[in-house]
From Swiss-Prot:
Pfam families linked: PolyA_pol, PolyA_pol_RNAbd, tRNA_NucTran2_2
Gene label: cca
Organism: Bacillus anthracis
Annotated binding of CTP, by residue: 26, 29, 110, 153, 156, 159, 162
Protein name: CCA-adding enzyme
Source organism phylogeny: Bacteria, Bacillati, Bacillota, Bacilli, Bacillales
Known partners and oligomeric status: Homodimer.
Catalysed reaction equations from the record: a tRNA precursor + 2 CTP + ATP = a tRNA with a 3' CCA end + 3 diphosphate; a tRNA with a 3' CCA end + 2 CTP + ATP = a tRNA with a 3' CCACCA end + 3 diphosphate
Protein EC: 2.7.7.72
Cofactor(s) recorded in Swiss-Prot or TrEMBL: Mg(2+)
BP-aspect Gene Ontology terms: RNA repair; tRNA 3'-terminal CCA addition
Length: 397
């Protein structure tokens, strides 16, 4: 409750000005579940302009949706006016937002009952839709009619399965049936929004359970490049996903599980950044080499420790080995390398030009590469004079 206490002065100030105000959303849910608290959000009957007038330190980030960031005790908090939403367009966004003075009207527009619980600054729960009961049963239940909620915003179906993965809850029967019925509406949603939810699914503590629900509800069949992947997705549920430390590893392992032959094409379709695509593909390529042989100095040097650590964790999951010392072994091998990058070489292209009676050309880069490999393999000490002597002995100068 300590973090809520820091924000309670905002609620107290709003109430002193004659407004209602409550803590709402995921932070309240996580408090009840006893999970780490993320962002703390506040809902109020005060209109955005009233909030800004009351709190001088504010940032008007989403006034059309009624949201103002209020800075209190050095921390930013989203303060959003109670609102209701009109008919939705394209199964993804409301055509308009109306500000209201009723907490109930605000809570009834939310996706799941566990996310529709409000809390006073004293810690008293305002639970109008049996959200605490759903949490006790470890069930994900929509607020009101599931068909209505999913037709309003089809991404809620993906969010529901993401919560299965992150919380370990189960989909309530009617909620699950509605996902099976309305899953096709997900095709109206921007892939960027789906990717965010899918990544949270893959990195969730109960990822295997989430993937099973993805298959059972047939929602996977409405996702890019996964339409024909039922058997492969089920294969993915047979592995242990607990050892991954990054989203890069989770995506690399997922692509391995579904047998994706063109990972770059898949990832571009899912709108990943070029940097992320590069890292995921690098992990997959490294695993391919790792399957052929154990780590040696050259492979480890060329791979780099960042990719090597991730590749080793994914490789261990692939072969269903739970030897937690394997990554430590990679780290030890890397630390023992004579150099960690080309920048650490005690020789430059200018040195080579001074030593050799040749004009500049491609031979300089080729020679640097030979020296680099020789240092990494331990054939020459990384000292300028030693390198010069080695070049002369090898008739390379």
């Amino acid at each position: 409750m300590e973090r809520f206490k820091k924000a309670s002065s905002i609620i107290e100030t709003l109430k002193q000005q004659g407004h209602e105000a409550y803590f709402v959303g995921g932070s309240v849910r996580d408090l009840i579940i006893d999970r780490p608290i993320g962002d703390i959000d506040i809902a109020t009957s005060a209109l955005p302009e009233e909030v800004m007038a009351i709190f001088p330190r504010h940032v008007p980030v989403g006034l059309e949706h009624g949201t103002v960031i209020v800075v209190e005790n050095g921390e930013p908090y989203e303060v959003t006016t109670f609102r209701t939403e009109s008919e939705y367009e394209d199964f993804r966004r409301p055509s308009s937002v109306q500000f209201v003075r009723s907490l109930e009207e605000d809570l009834k527009r939310r996706d799941f009952t566990m996310n529709a619980i409000a809390m006073t600054e004293e810690g008293e729960m305002v639970d109008l839709f049996a959200g605490q009961e759903a949490i006790q049963k470890r069930e994900i239940v929509t607020v009101g009619n599931a068909a209505d909620r999913f037709q309003e915003d089809a991404l809620r179906m993906m969010r529901g399965i993401r919560f299965v993965s992150t919380l370990g809850f189960s989909l309530e029967t009617k909620t699950k049936q509605a996902i099976e019925t309305y899953g096709h509406l997900l095709e109206h949603i921007a892939i960027e929004r789906i990717t965010v939810e899918f990544e949270k699914l893959l990195t969730g503590t109960y990822c295997v359970k989430g993937l099973k629900e993805l298959v059972e509800t047939k929602l996977f069949s409405h996702l890019p490049y996964l339409q024909m992947s039922e058997e492969r997705l089920l294969k993915a549920t047979q592995y242990n996903w607990d050892s991954f430390e990054t989203d890069i590893e989770a995506w690399a392992f997922f692509l391995y599980c579904i047998g994706e032959e063109h990972p770059s094409v898949f990832l571009r379709q899912w709108k990943f950044s070029n940097k992320k695509i590069k890292d995921i593909v690098a992990v997959l390529l490294t695993i391919r080499k790792r399957k052929e042989k154990d780590w040696d100095t050259v492979l480890l040097y060329k791979t780099g420790i960042h990719i090597a650590e991730m590749a080793e964790r994914v490789y261990e999951a692939m072969i269903e080995s739970y030897d937690h010392t394997s990554v430590e072994r990679v780290q030890t091998l890397f630390q023992a390398l004579p150099i960690k990058s080309r920048q650490e070489m005690d020789v430059t292209g200018n040195d080579l030009l001074n030593w050799a009676s040749k004009k500049p050309g491609p031979w300089v880069a080729e020679m640097i590469q030979k020296i680099e490999e020789a240092i990494v393999q331990g054939n020459v000490v990384n000292e300028k004079e030693c390198i010069r002597e080695w070049l002369q002995e090898c008739n390379l100068l």
